Curated annotation (Swiss-Prot):
The keyword ATP-binding does not apply. Coiled coil: none annotated. It comes from Orgyia pseudotsugata multicapsid polyhedrosis virus. This is DNA-binding protein. Probably phosphorylated in infected cells. Keywords: DNA-binding, Late protein, Phosphoprotein, Repeat, Viral nucleoprotein, Virion. Residues 5-22 are annotated as: 2 X 6 AA repeats of R-R-R-R-S-S. The keyword Ion transport does not apply.
């Protein structure tokens, strides 16, 4: 539903472009931190446990 509405608003161009940029930048930043933090914890725990 959100995607459909966003695509429909493409006529504006400005709102879609600005919102898309913010979403794209925020999307990679959030998951990257979570993934990195989880990876580091998992690796550290696995290594420490194995060691």
């Amino acid at each position: 539903m959100v995607y459909r509405r966003r695509r429909s608003r493409s006529a504006d161009g400005t709102y879609t472009r600005r919102r898309r940029s913010s979403g794209y930048r925020r999307r990679p930043g959030r998951p990257r931190t979570y993934r990195r933090s989880r990876s580091a914890t998992r690796r550290s725990g696995y290594r420490r446990r194995r060691y």
